[in-house]
């Protein structure tokens, strides 16, 4: 039995510039961190006495006699991609709900590949895991996804990612533990109660990207990455500026697509801001999932009270990325 443990991520700035339609022409950039919320995947060879070849347990249970019968698209594509001839039992457990803007779909793809490679006795690099996850999602499954989530899941930590046509870079953000802890202590996360398929939200945005009608907005969003880095790396700068920039980024992001926000989500944001948040954003493509807010510690109880009808999720940063935590 193999167990992989793969983190999800919080993206601060640059989202939308990690789609090939944009970065292959203009270049993209993202500032993000992985957090201590994980997807756990166990894989093992099917017992020879079983009356099925594949058993996959997630929000539902699949038992299949052929690969083609598997309905979970990533599981089917990953097994096919790796050309694994024998049967498999796969169990998936997640700390947080799926389809909520934290990159969990790509964390799953990366974690599954990692576990399957370990089962076959192969050690693979973080770079290979990320690249193969991107290949599975973008090429084999033809999903409308970017590249930041796969890289975050594989590498882990607080990173500045740079995207070019033939080059995806992951650069660790070099700041002191104290500065990193200061950022972490000012962040709060709340679940809106809404989940959604990012591909549906992204249809309008991707079309606008292809039509080049949001180039100015995407350039502004990309430029915020450098601004965010400057705030983090210059200890003379007030960390609250990071929150102000988050607010600026969220206002800009909402112009990319009419599906990113709605009245319900706008009301949540307004409540948090009125209670003391300096800025925030809806994670991922938008339309639901998790809000992250930048809130000075002395104001956090007030924000908590204002959003008492939502579930708060406490979290911390993590530095490891995907890893194998059990082999037997």
Listing of model-derived features with the role each one plays in the protein:
Residues 94-100, 278:
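Short pre-catalytic strand/loop immediately N-terminal to key active-site residues, enriched for Gly-Thr
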Residues 1-13, 18-21, 30-32, 38-84, ...:
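C-terminal nucleotide
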Residues 288:
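Glycine-rich active-site/cofactor-binding loop and its immediate structural neighborhood
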Residues 84-91:
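Conserved catalytic cysteine-centered active-site region
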Residues 23-25, 103-104, 144-145:
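Short glycine/proline-enriched turns and hinge-like loops at secondary-structure junctions
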Residues 67-69, 101-104:
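Short, solvent-exposed loop/turn segments at secondary-structure boundaries
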Residues 102-126, 154:
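DPxDG-like acidic metal-binding loop motif
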């Amino acid at each position: 039995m193999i167990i992989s443990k793969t983190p999800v991520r919080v993206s601060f700035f640059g989202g939308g510039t990690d789609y090939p339609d944009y970065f292959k022409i203009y270049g993209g950039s993202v500032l993000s961190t992985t957090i201590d919320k994980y997807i756990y995947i166990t894989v093992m060879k099917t017992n020879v006495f079983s009356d099925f070849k594949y058993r996959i347990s997630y929000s539902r249970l699949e038992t299949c006699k052929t690969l083609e019968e598997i309905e979970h698209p990533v599981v089917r594509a990953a097994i096919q991609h790796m050309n694994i001839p024998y049967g498999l039992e796969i169990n998936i457990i997640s700390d947080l709900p799926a389809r909520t803007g934290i990159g969990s779909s790509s964390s799953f793809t990366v974690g599954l590949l990692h576990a399957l490679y370990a089962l076959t006795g192969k050690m693979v690099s973080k770079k290979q895991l990320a690249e193969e996850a991107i290949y599975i999602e973008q090429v084999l499954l033809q999903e409308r996804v970017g590249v930041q989530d796969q890289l975050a899941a594989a590498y882990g930590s607080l990173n500045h990612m740079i995207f070019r046509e033939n080059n995806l870079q992951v650069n660790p953000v070099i700041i002191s533990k104290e500065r990193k802890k200061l950022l972490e202590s000012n962040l709060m996360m709340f679940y809106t109660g809404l989940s959604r398929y990012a591909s549906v939200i992204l249809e309008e945005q991707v079309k606008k990207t292809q039509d080049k009608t949001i180039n100015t907005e995407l350039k502004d969003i990309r430029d915020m990455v450098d601004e965010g880095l400057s705030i983090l790396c210059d200890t003379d700068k007030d960390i609250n500026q990071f929150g102000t920039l988050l607010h600026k980024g969220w206002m800009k992001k909402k112009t990319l697509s009419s599906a990113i926000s709605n009245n319900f989500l706008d009301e949540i944001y307004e409540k948090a801001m009125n209670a003391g948040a300096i800025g925030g954003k809806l994670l991922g493509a938008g339309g639901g999932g998790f809000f992250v807010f930048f809130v000075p510690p002395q104001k956090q109880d007030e924000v908590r009270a204002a959003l008492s009808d939502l579930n708060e999720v406490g979290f911390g940063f993590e530095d490891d990325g995907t890893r194998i935590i059990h082999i037997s």
